[in-house]
């Protein structure tokens, strides 16, 4: 297979990934592959572009490094072109409502007829099967959070609240990435393709597992946090200092002993309620939990963030200032690791945003291209799989493909 023009880099160089999906979840999987060196083809509808394009800045991050193909993959010759593309594809990711592709005639079996080694990842809100009530419903971030038990655990004691920005989309997209790579590993061993059914609500069910286990195995459900503090453990969560907010985790025998001395609670150490060797203070079960919070709040409020960070570093207590977005760029850790970077858009502008993660030492990722325009690479991709100029123009004339103007 001849690859499309692009630099060779990263741990996934030589891999061809194709995705069909809009907005965030499915495309985030494609974004990860593209930043790790895979050749990633983004399929968009011919009649209208991905709705993410209406956003002024985010698409320049989420669609960088991609090749843009505008093709009607469900109709006539457009479907034929899509299936021909699948013959040279390693991983295909589609994000839609339930078994939408199967309903339109593109089943796993049809895809495997064209490529027996193809890894297929289906990403939907409620999965490829189940009840009629749910399987075919649309889903976005908040829907998946609400249906999974994740949302009800977040927020404040007075009201649940979804986690933003778009947590379920990103977790689901990353799940698609890792699952597809796991499947590809097996395919290269057996020569037999794989189909993966990723339900966003099940991803979030798993992400919300920590507190749920107490309910599933005893009927006890953890309360929601209060003002950003850990619902179970004192000294853990969000706290206010004299000049702003920090988060901290009061965990460890020595850490608790030294902190208690600072906040005036040394006399509680070694009591039946806080015996020697205590590593965590339970907010509810320990009768001194509320007092610990009261004393800690007072001590923190009397000190600046810088003072708290210095003292906690001496005590080996984990803490961090709650940074505002403007503070990120100048933070020395961000600067040292180049966590924020710049790249050129296709129209020559400079765009700034998060850098590639994680950092591969021997085969690093790379930003080699900005977001392509609608249909920008259609002709190049179709030529790559054997279509002539006349073939491409015929698809365009029938409204089955769009090429860049």
Swiss-Prot record:
Q: Where is the active site?
A: 169 (nucleophile)
Q: What is this protein called?
A: L-carnitine CoA-transferase
Q: Which keywords are on file for this protein?
A: Cytoplasm, Transferase
| Cell location | Cytoplasm
Q: Give a short account of what the protein does.
A: Catalyzes the reversible transfer of the CoA moiety from gamma-butyrobetainyl-CoA to L-carnitine to generate L-carnitinyl-CoA and gamma-butyrobetaine. Is also able to catalyze the reversible transfer of the CoA moiety from gamma-butyrobetainyl-CoA or L-carnitinyl-CoA to crotonobetaine to generate crotonobetainyl-CoA.
Pathway(s) per entry: Amine and polyamine metabolism; carnitine metabolism
EC number(s): the record gives 2.8.3.21
Q: Which GO terms describe its cellular component?
A: cytoplasm
Whether Transferase counts among this entry's keywords is yes
Provide the GO biological process annotations: carnitine metabolic process
Q: What is its main location?
A: cytoplasm
Which family does the UniProt entry place this protein in? Belongs to the CoA-transferase III family. CaiB subfamily.
Q: Which domain of life is it from?
A: Bacteria
Annotated binding of CoA, by residue: 97, 104
Q: Which InterPro entries match?
A: CoA-transferase_III (IPR050509), CoA-Trfase_CaiB (IPR023452), CoA-Trfase_fam_III (IPR003673), CoA-Trfase_III_dom3_sf (IPR044855), CoA-Trfase_III_dom_1_sf (IPR023606)
GO MF terms held by the record? L-carnitine CoA-transferase activity
Reaction(s) the record says it catalyses: crotonobetainyl-CoA + (R)-carnitine = crotonobetaine + (R)-carnitinyl-CoA; 4-(trimethylamino)butanoyl-CoA + (R)-carnitine = (R)-carnitinyl-CoA + 4-(trimethylamino)butanoate
Subunit organization: Homodimer.
């Amino acid at each position: 297979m001849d690859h499309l023009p692009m630099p060779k880099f990263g741990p996934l160089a030589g891999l061809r990934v194709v995705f069909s999906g809009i907005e965030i979840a499915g495309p985030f999987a494609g974004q990860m592959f593209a930043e790790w060196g895979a050749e990633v083809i983004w399929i968009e509808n011919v009649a209208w572009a991905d709705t993410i394009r209406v956003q002024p800045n985010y698409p320049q991050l989420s669609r960088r490094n991609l090749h843009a193909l505008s093709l009607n993959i469900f109709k006539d010759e457009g479907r034929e072109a899509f299936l021909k593309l699948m013959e040279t594809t390693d991983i295909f990711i589609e994000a839609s409502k339930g078994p939408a592709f199967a309903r339109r005639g593109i089943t796993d079996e049809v895809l495997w007829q064209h490529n027996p080694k193809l890894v297929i990842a289906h990403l939907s809100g409620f999965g490829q099967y189940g009840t009629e009530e749910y399987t075919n419903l649309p889903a976005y971030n908040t829907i998946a959070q609400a249906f999974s038990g994740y949302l009800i655990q977040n927020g404040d004691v007075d009201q649940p609240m979804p986690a933003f920005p778009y947590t379920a989309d990103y977790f689901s997209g990353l799940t698609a990435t890792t699952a597809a790579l796991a499947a590809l590993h097996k395919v290269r061993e057996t020569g037999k393709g794989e189909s993966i059914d990723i339900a966003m609500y099940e991803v979030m069910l798993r992400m919300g597992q920590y507190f749920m286990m107490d309910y599933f195995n005893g009927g006890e459900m953890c309360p929601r946090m209060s003002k950003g503090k850990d619902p179970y453990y004192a000294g853990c969560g969000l706290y206010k200092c004299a000049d702003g907010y920090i988060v901290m985790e009061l965990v460890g025998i020595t850490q608790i002993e030294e902190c208690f001395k600072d906040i005036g609670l040394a006399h509680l150490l070694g009591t039946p309620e806080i015996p020697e060797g205590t590593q965590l203070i339970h907010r509810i079960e320990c009768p001194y939990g509320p007092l610990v919070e009261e004393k800690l709040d007072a001590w923190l409020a009397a000190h600046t963030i810088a003072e708290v960070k210095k003292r906690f570093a001496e005590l080996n207590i984990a803490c961090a200032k709650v940074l505002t977005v403007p503070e990120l760029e100048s933070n020395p850790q961000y600067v040292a690791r180049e966590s924020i970077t710049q790249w050129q858009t296709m129209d020559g502008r400079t765009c700034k945003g998060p850098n590639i993660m994680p950092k591969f030492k021997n085969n690093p990722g790379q930003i080699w291209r900005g977001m392509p325009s609608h249909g920008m690479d259609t002709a190049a991709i179709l030529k790559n799989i054997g279509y002539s100029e006349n073939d491409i123009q015929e698809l365009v004339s029938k409204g089955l493909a769009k090429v860049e103007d």
